[in-house]
Amino acid sequence: MLNSNWINYAKPFAMLLLMVGLRITAVNAQTGNSFAYNDTAFLLNGKPFQMISGEIHYPRVPKEAWRHRMKMAKAMGINTIGTYVFWNVHEPQKGKYDFSGNNDIAAFVKIAQEEGLWVVLRPSPYVCAEWEFGGYPYWLQNEKGLQVRSRETKYIQAYRQYIMQIGKQLATLQIHKGGNIILVQVENEYGSYSNDKEYLELNRKMFVEAGFDGTLYTCDPAKDVDKGHLPGLFPAVNGLDKPSQMKSLVRKYNNGKGPFFIAEWYPAWFDWWGEKHHTVPAENYSGKLDTVLAAGISINMYMFHGGTTRGFMNGANYYDSSGYEPQISSYDYDAPLDEAGNATPKFWQFRNAISKNLPAGTVLPDVPSAKKVISIPAITLKKQVSIFDVLPKSKSSSNPLTFEALNQAYGYVLYRTTLNGGKAGILKIKELRDYGIVMINGKRVGILDRRLRQDSLFLKLPAGKITIDILVENLGRVNFGPHLLKNLKGITQSVLFNGNELKGWQMFSLPFEKLDGINFTATAKKSDAPVLKHGEFTLEETGDTYLDMSKWGKGCVWINGHNLGRYWEIGPQQTIYVPAEWLKKGKNELIVFELIHTDKTLLDAVTQPELNKLRK
């Protein structure tokens, strides 16, 4: 979601810095570049510097498109890129690290430097960000007694090992070492969660141990700065865009001094399934942006470009009042750049506001030309395979096992048991996480949805021995709030029929990390169970496009091996963005996993997104 933290570390040299009027200085001996701040301003190479930062998350944008998005940022007047670093992306399994391809965070930072942009790095390790488990890897929950965002020993040990790996990738890219990282954030809106200053100090020490010895900071919403700020570190503030109030708050926690940084300035908001798409007119914010910049306040725009939360990496909110709210795959955010990287009205109005506040004579770069959008004829998915025909070897247990117990992070698990039929009653799944399709002898008989607080289903069982299958989907672990510590997935307790607990379960893991080796067959036969559909289409040219999923039910889509994300007929998102970078001239492969409307075979492509169509 939205979190950022400003921290400054200069203990060994504190007295010296104070003598020269600076509280933190990072100098690169080779190039002479330095970043610092005094009582009123940030200083870049000794001169006042106003950060105009835009947030872009590298996993949400194809690697091939990173440079384009940065060129767009610079053309709007952005001089800095902010990004979280996502633990579950880089350590998907304990001790196994991945910095390749779209996870190459060092390449992302270096491209920003090549484009003349500074970087605000936010390794936290908690990111919120509408991201699965707030960025934490699922396997942390398998460590007995581990408690995230605390001084608990197992958590700190895992966290330290991870942040050391991040340091190996990025510490040398700080400004005083020849790079372009000017700020590094420690933790993330911690005041919204707790107030343990010793834990925050542990964070600071680990960052320094990992090589992040430049300018560190913390960030919190205005109401939580007292709890989330670590004395001695710079307090940035999220969401407060009234200059007098913002400056007063920073001075309160920074010994009466500046400078001033809105670490998350929100041009709109995110979306979740079953609720309308959030938009805010550009004119509602362009004036606010002008006011903030005119007051000399630095900002990080959350988001400048949201992109797409692909695969199964969306998070969820959970509140006792509203319940479970999984977020959609589009992270459009009604940002200055839309999901595909195109300029929106906000882009142009924000560009004007920024231009007014730049030094006299400054000329912004030309805006890159509009991206090509292509129309694809309707695609027929001629082949399919039932979920029952792709089941792997099962794991048996008396009681249902969670995803975590199966060492599975995301996707689906099929739970199977048998019982004697010839009776009717209530099937109850205690603590279903999150969406379950119930099948009797291979035929769907009902759906249970955690969003709707559904856990029970009336069943009339046929005579004889029957098989009950329950396909459970992880719709995204909670990424914000106290329920962060209650994030197991699957059937997390028990299954009852007429009050009697069902035993003797088989679990089939379906993480769908790769779809290699699946044998699709050409058939018109309707499946009573969820199906994987396969089709091909040929292109003479590539460009961005959108798949119209409004006639389908629920599932996810792969193009040429890339998991593009989820779709769900309830909306508001009805289209899936297909980036040009993942299409190719000639033959392209399309796979759809459809849970509900298994008879569908035709898929349309459109040239415009549909992100605001609800279907209750």
What kind of feature is each model-predicted range?
Residues 51-62, 87-104, 141-161, 185-196, ...:
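The substrate-binding groove and active-site-proximal loops of carbohydrate-active enzymes
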Residues 66-132, 204-209:
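Aromatic-lined substrate-binding rim segments of carbohydrate-active enzymes
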Residues 209-210, 241-338, 342-345, 349, ...:
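Catalytic-core region of carbohydrate-active enzymes that cleave or remodel glycosidic bonds
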Residues 155-230:
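Active-site neighborhood of glycoside hydrolase catalytic domains
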Residues 94-103, 114, 124-150, 200, ...:
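Aromatic- and acidic-residue-enriched segments that line the glycan-binding/catalytic groove
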Residues 28-80, 110, 542:
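N-terminal carbohydrate-binding accessory modules
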Residues 424-439, 468, 537-560, 567-568, ...:
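Aromatic-lined ligand-binding clefts that engage carbohydrates, nucleic acids, or primary amines
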Residues 104-121, 144-181:
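An active-site-proximal structural segment forming one wall of the substrate-binding cleft
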